Amino acid sequence: MAVSRLDRLFILLDTGTTPVTRKAAAQQLGEVVKLHPHELNNLLSKVLIYLRSANWDTRIAAGQAVEAIVKNVPEWNPVPRTRQEPTSESSMEDSPTTERLNFDRFDICRLLQHGASLLGSAGAEFEVQDEKSGEVDPKERIARQRKLLQKKLGLNMGEAIGMSTEELFNDEDLDYTPTSASFVNKQPTLQAAELIDSEFRAGMSNRQKNKAKRMAKLFAKQRSRDAVETNEKSNDSTDGEPEEKRRKIANVVINQSANDSKVLIDNIPDSSSLIEETNEWPLESFCEELCNDLFNPSWEVRHGAGTGLREILKAHGKSGGKMGDSTLEEMIQQHQEWLEDLVIRLLCVFALDRFGDFVSDEVVAPVRETCAQTLGVVLKHMNETGVHKTVDVLLKLLTQEQWEVRHGGLLGIKYALAVRQDVINTLLPKVLTRIIEGLQDLDDDVRAVAAASLVPVVESLVYLQTQKVPFIINTLWDALLELDDLTASTNSIMTLLSSLLTYPQVQQCSIQQSLTVLVPRVWPFLHHTISSVRRAALETLFTLLSTQDQNSSSWLIPILPDMLRHIFQFCVLESSQEILDLIHKVWMELLSKASVQYVVAAACPWMGAWLCLMMQPSHLPIDLNMLLEVKARAKEKTGGKVRQGQSQNKEVLQEYIAGADTIMEDPATRDFVVMRARMMAAKLLGALCCCICDPGVNVVTQEIKPAESLGQLLLFHLNSKSALQRISVALVICEWAALQKECKAVTLAVQPRLLDILSEHLYYDEIAVPFTRMQNECKQLISSLADVHIEVGNRVNNNVLTIDQASDLVTTVFNEATSSFDLNPQVLQQLDSKRQQVQMTVTETNQEWQVLQLRVHTFAACAVVSLQQLPEKLNPIIKPLMETIKKEENTLVQNYAAQCIAKLLQQCTTRTPCPNSKIIKNLCSSLCVDPYLTPCVTCPVPTQSGQENSKGSTSEKDGMHHTVTKHRGIITLYRHQKAAFAITSRRGPTPKAVKAQIADLPAGSSGNILVELDEAQKPYLVQRRGAEFALTTIVKHFGGEMAVKLPHLWDAMVGPLRNTIDINNFDGKSLLDKGDSPAQELVNSLQVFETAAASMDSELHPLLVQHLPHLYMCLQYPSTAVRHMAARCVGVMSKIATMETMNIFLEKVLPWLGAIDDSVKQEGAIEALACVMEQLDVGIVPYIVLLVVPVLGRMSDQTDSVRFMATQCFATLIRLMPLEAGIPDPPNMSAELIQLKAKERHFLEQLLDGKKLENYKIPVPINAELRKYQQDGVNWLAFLNKYKLHGILCDDMGLGKTLQSICILAGDHCHRAQEYARSKLAECMPLPSLVVCPPTLTGHWVDEVGKFCSREYLNPLHYTGPPTERIRLQHQVKRHNLIVASYDVVRNDIDFFRNIKFNYCILDEGHVIKNGKTKLSKAVKQLTANYRIILSGTPIQNNVLELWSLFDFLMPGFLGTERQFAARYGKPILASRDARSSSREQEAGVLAMDALHRQVLPFLLRRMKEDVLQDLPPKIIQDYYCTLSPLQVQLYEDFAKSRAKCDVDETVSSATLSEETEKPKLKATGHVFQALQYLRKLCNHPALVLTPQHPEFKTTAEKLAVQNSSLHDIQHAPKLSALKQLLLDCGLGNGSTSESGTESVVAQHRILIFCQLKSMLDIVEHDLLKPHLPSVTYLRLDGSIPPGQRHSIVSRFNNDPSIDVLLLTTHVGGLGLNLTGADTVVFVEHDWNPMRDLQAMDRAHRIGQKRVVNVYRLITRGTLEEKIMGLQKFKMNIANTVISQENSSLQSMGTDQLLDLFTLDKDGKAEKADTSTSGKASMKSILENLSDLWDQEQYDSEYSLENFMHSLK
């Protein structure tokens, strides 16, 4: 059954997989109110259910829905009554002053004394609900309680993981003694709502009494309905919902009243309880409901109520409580009283709520926090007196003993201060004392809120309460002493302290000596486990330092050594880039504020230790003696709460460089973060070296100057044999030299040594272990050879082998030695095995050494270049730098070398001889080394790797549709398809997302970029990436002087372009004759151009623009590779010089698309457009209008490559089209283009907005009056015709798709005939059209054409019959202009049909070709037609891939190849639905869905019956449950024990295990299908399975014979009994008589009976109708009836009302037929595919039906059938979400409209989930049984004060 669009939006609120999806659904609900204001209360009543949901996401989404809805409700501002006007009766009744709560009667202390606490819940969910509990045996009751309690606590999974839960609680714990009512009444607490009503209200007004009466009337019916709603809504979150509850709501009634066209589906709450009174604010009743919910025992309901009220008041805070027919003064008073009433309710929540979430490091009280935000919104609109009264009550809460009450009070004050800054002068003095007490509270969560409450009013605090600030500052400093890793208030206190210290006044009032004592209190937080605390600590230090000048920093001197040590070791241990940058900022500020002498004195003793820390090996823990330990004072707790683990002693954790949390990362990632930490440490020490080398501290009279000491220290480490020591010192020298131009003492000490290092080849200490292992293994190998009398000792060094000698040993020496001896094969095998082991060790050792050697030489070279004292010979410097560019896998090292090369080139510009040209040439060669990026002219795309070839020819053909040759093809298209092939071919789970701390890697790279690459590609990628880093760095370094100072680079970019291309006389043939060499040179030049241009200084952009004509000429170069590179360069140019590039492109290049005689031009132009679109992304939007139509024209191009590329471009443009509206014309656009743009925009408006379509006047008479929506459909089809487009008309079944198609067919044939008669042009020549449909409908189509249109205009040929008949008909085709044939006939005669060019090809029920791999689909796609139209009421039946096949017929390539489609849409969508998916993957899935919907939107037209047919009677669907007969039960149970069932279990299990890697075997799947078929047949009738071959047949037959029964008695088939009763109830078969007493000729009801199987129809006919209901007349329509005769049966049934019943199979009778003669539909069986059942029932429920249609579905209870119905509902959600009513009005598609397609990836998972609890449970299933709250990030987002304040603006 169809779910309405509105219901789907609500379903998304609850089940949307991402917050983005839920928010989009919420926004669309707001749009509904905008268009249908009268639906306000209906919508709000539905939203209320979701505000009460147990699911956090659902409540937040419901709050967003409330926000979206109320934003579209006009502000309530009734016209005030003047004092002279008489008041209405209703307002006379009211007494506003008495009906509201007010402060005068409110006593918060009394409430605290007598009110019951509001906890997480009332505990009702843990009670056993059993009306007969008194009669049950106590043991049974306890057993049931135990089971229920285990389930609720998530302990029912214990046994599955081998954990016993029996002893957690015993029977005595569960037994209870009923408590007498009198005892309960003596309890001193009352429910909050009761207490408020009884104690604080003065009485009820007349209006309230009247309202109470109305509510009482509604209460009875609402109570039962609420129960049902609650059960229904909790199904998702409650696993153990009893089956009986679900069945209560199984009967679904679709009701449609005469004056309302909306369809009501499922249980919709009665909105009458929320109907507003005429003089009331429209939202009054809804707010009252929410106010009542504030005191619900369940925290989730309270939270939802607070959320709803907050959103309403943001938009309508000025309207609450106002009554119409009141004076202005009365309205103001009513408003303030209403606000006061609400404030008091919120204060009661603060007082009584005790629920808090302790999941994270800080308590989050969702109810109190949300109510505090709501209070903030209320106070915004309250008068000043009310604000002060509110604050007075909040202050009373701060005096209470319970920490939760104080916490709530401070939350209220926090938002009050933030919102009412206008009265801060009076508010702040009132509350400040209490807040300061809060800062000293024993409870750390209270302290956290107290600190947070002052952050937004820091400025006011400093200026208004200056005298209190010193005390607050001291309090905060003292609080730092009490904080530790587990305290909650750390972040808030650090933030407040940092905020206060930014004000000079605060600095002045701080005593200098005190900072010396206070600042060290920050040290522990530099090493805090939570990054936000570390950040806050650094920001506090930076604030302290930046607000001081050097003269007033005396407090810094005593603590300077410790501060330097803490910050440096913090740097070494940190892994976050953001925090590392902040460390550098604080360090530099510290060095600038402290005197140089003091810095040198403090730092020099520790310089050596710091260098050692920086040199720490990455795999070894740091010696804790080298770290300055931080001792935080232990916090003594005397009250409040203690978190788990707070009292435990902390373990001493091992520390590693770059953080212990990264130690388990993969080697590439770990190497990246460690190198980043070393480089940052080098920056800090480099800055420190500047201080040490300062002339002021290096006085001549000193014995030992600091600079000289530094030089000696650095030299000591450079003389070490450790690679890490050398690398670290070289890095420090680089950073120091970058900051300070010259320091002779250090330079003289280290420069010679650095030059020596560049020529040294050492075996470093770091490879000692593998080197020693290599020596030992080599000696063992030599010894093993000696054992078999092979002496090799004389050929190798007997002492220590070098790596080269070891390598020779295991290759040349070993092979020569063994080959000269005749060894036993077994001995030789053993020796070779040892050799391979040694060879592996040698290779590993060599690789480690090579990496270290290269890095040592590279950083030494960088140091020499940084010192700016280059030696005479530059080769030792240049060589390692270039090698790093070519070979280094760590991007940080490559980047460092790239920066050094840029500096080297700068220093060498004036040098003779100058090495720059050689360096540039080498870099350009390296840049072009990757054939995947820089194509080779002779072979433009690299040959397929063996891996792809191994996939087999079929998959390769499927994935790589486009072939590229030397002269033809589009490389961009090839790469898109190859990428899609790679993505869809990848097996296994999606790779994990890169963690946050390594996410900030250089663009285009990551720490683990080489993990998934083919080993053969890896060197190319590394070398190309290094060259790219180097060239972009060089270009940025030289800026605007690049062309002058580096003429060789400029020439490499544009030289071949100028020399090869003559823009005035371009001759492709002569270029071809010159051979491949100039073309390859041009390709390489363009690669350099692309790389360098993107980073070039804007001063050089005009020079680049001068070469645009050359680039455009290259787009028609005969070489594919040149065209490709030129297209990429045009793309880059469009990004850096958009206006100039696009103007020339539109004027010169875009017209080439129409050059159908020159495919080279077309390929170049379309590839360039693709590259421009890729580079500009949304920047292309201003030009879209001018691009769409030319691209559209190429979507049917004869050249495959052009067609595929054009469809891809068009698909992208279509998605961006909605953004085009309102974008101004780009500057400097020519007048011609602006004029053309206006013309093309008209087309776009029609494409995107169906309402702007031109009305199409059908030029031929049609014998029917078209309804408006049918005329709209014809207009749409005519629009497609005009622009040579194709589409899917997917109107709901029964809306006249056939008629609309006939109209456009007849109209276009007439138009073509007239045009041809006038012009005689070949393109207007009359052509026949083809309609392909299911065989049942061919006759129907011919009749419909004859009925609606004269043969003069459409002359159909019914092409059917056996082959000989069809051959005869083929000769008649020329005499007809319309051929109607079935799909099978077209498939069989495709050789005939493919040779005819058709005008229209219409596929009726076109979803038949949903599987593109069937012979039928392949045949249909061979048809040639000007226009292709698909008619289908259900274009998507199971999954989204079906849509690809339909569009592959309409517009091949529009959605890419099947693999591209799967890569772009299928893979992300599937990944986003995986339980393990990251938030990034979920977002990608949502965006993919949005992109797909947007892309296909203009080519789908969808209207639903309930939207367009006001006169169609309702359709009522009812499920009719039957219970299995004893015989069926026996057979069902026998099957459950059978071998067949075991086979199925094994198959499903193996399929589950293999689903990540491969699909289950076909044969195994067949077992499952057979088993399912068996059970389905058994549910229908035992005779269908109990055949003579059945093992139980004989026994059963004998048993029945004894009982005088047979297998065909209807008592054994409850469905037949139920069907008989239904027929009798409909007045059939019981000899029904008319009112006159005579037997009625025509029955009151006529019935369609649908079965799946022909054999079941036989049973219905022979076992039920003939023996039991002989008077029932019936016809039959199934597969046994020849297609040619089926139409006559349909006509006879429709035209002869005396035929009571039509028996049909769903497959034959469920498509396209018009059976409006029936008004009742019975499904004896159900289809796996819900669309088929839907189509079947709509045979009767369609245009022409005058009576209510009743649909009965016979379902056997508790069997497979119930699961089939559940599966149907799931698939319906898929189809309705993709192809929705939005397609009826294209303008309704906003950028935030998303689709939520899949919740499962294939059918079997639903059942699989149910069976997964047997045996050992997976961790996933255990976790799913436990409920939890949102994580901390989500809380931060929801309760961010900054976000909240922004939302009030």
Curated annotation (Swiss-Prot):
GO MF entries: ATP binding; ATP hydrolysis activity; ATP-dependent activity, acting on DNA; DNA binding; helicase activity; TBP-class protein binding; transcription coregulator activity
Binding site for ATP: 1291-1298
One GO term (biological process): negative regulation of DNA-templated transcription
Motif (DEGH box): 1404-1407
Domain annotation Helicase C-terminal: ranges: 1636-1790
A cellular component annotation (GO) from this entry: nucleoplasm
Region Disordered, residue ranges: 77-97, 219-247
Keywords from the named record: ATP-binding, DNA-binding, Helicase, Hydrolase, Nucleotide-binding, Nucleus, Phosphoprotein, Repeat
CDD domains: DEXHc_Mot1 (cd17999), SF2_C_SNF (cd18793)
InterPro entries xrefs: ARM-like, ARM-type_fold, Helicase_ATP-bd, Helicase_C-like, Mot1, Mot1_ATP-bd, Mot1_central_dom, P-loop_NTPase
Subcellular location: Nucleus
Predominant cellular place of this UniProt entry's protein: nucleus
Helicase ATP-binding domain sequence ranges: 1278-1453
Modified residues (Phosphoserine): 91, 95
EC annotation from Swiss-Prot or TrEMBL: 3.6.4.-
Pfam families given in the database record: DUF3535 (PF12054), Helicase_C (PF00271), SNF2-rel_dom (PF00176)
Biased composition (Basic and acidic residues): 223-236
Biased composition regions of type Polar residues, renumbered to the chain: 85-97
Short sequence motif Nuclear localization signal: positions: 191-207
HEAT repeat start-end pairs: 385-422, 426-463, 513-550, 554-596, 818-855, 872-910, 1102-1139, 1182-1219
Family, as annotated: Belongs to the SNF2/RAD54 helicase family.
Biological role: Regulates transcription in association with TATA binding protein (TBP). Removes TBP from the TATA box in an ATP-dependent manner.
Assembly behavior: Associates with TBP to form B-TFIID. Binds DRAP1.
Record-given protein name: TATA-binding protein-associated factor 172
